[in-house]
Amino acid sequence: MSVSMDHRVLALAGVAQALQQVRRIAETGHSEAATVRTAMDSVFRVDAASPEAVYGSAAAVAPGLRLLHNYFRNQGQDDVLPRLALAVLQLERRFVRDTATVATVASGIDAAARQAQQLGDSNHPDVLSSLGGLYAQTISHLRPKVMVQGNPHYLGQAGVVAEIRALLLAAVRSAVLWRQMGGSLWDFLFAKRAMIEAVDRALR
C-alpha cells in the first residue's frame, strides 16, 4: 500500500468535487452546502498535518472519490469536468511559481478566515464573496484560464459568480496539496493502476 498515493487521491478528490460544485451551480444556480463547506474549510486549513485533516476526514471527499472511481472506469457522466480538472492542475503550476501572487492569496485567505470565524460559517455569502474576489484579483489572471460554462441566467448573478470563483480557489488549493503529496500528471499515464487501487481503498 502506498500512503503517498492514498494521500494524493484524497487531494485529487478535493479538486474533483469542488469542480463538480462549480459545474452544478453554473448550470442550476444551486450548490450542495455541505460539499461547498468542505471545500471552503480546506482553503483555511493551510497548516493541517494530513489530507484527511485538510478536509476534516476522508469521508468528506467521498463524492470526489466516486467521481474519480467513475472516471478511471470510463463511467464519468460529465465530459467537461475532466477538462476543468486538467486546467486547474496546470494552473496550479503557474500559481506556485508566482511568489507575489502566492503571498497575496495567503494574505487574503488569512483575512477571509478571520471573517469566517466572526460570522461563524465558512460558507457564509460574505465569505464566499471575499474568497471569490480574491480569486478574481489574483489567480484568474494566470494562464491557463479556467473557463466555466453554464446557464447565462445564473452566470449573470453576482452571488453565483462569487461562489464559483471561491470553489475554483478551493480546487487550486487541493491541486497544491496534490503536488505537495507528490502528485504529477505523469501519474495518469504511469501510475493509473496505483491510483485506482488507492481510490478503491478510500471508498471501502
Curated annotation (Swiss-Prot):
Keyword Cell inner membrane: yes
The UniProt record lists the keyword Cell inner membrane: yes
Keywords noted in UniProt: Cell inner membrane, Cell membrane, Cytoplasm, Membrane
SUPFAM superfamilies: YcfC-like
Record's subcellular location: Cytoplasm; Cell inner membrane
Major site of localization recorded for this protein: cytoplasm
PANTHER family referenced in this protein's UniProt entry, alphabetically: HIGH FREQUENCY LYSOGENIZATION PROTEIN HFLD
Protein name: High frequency lysogenization protein HflD homolog
Originating species: Xanthomonas oryzae pv. oryzae (strain MAFF 311018)
Gene name linked to the record: hflD
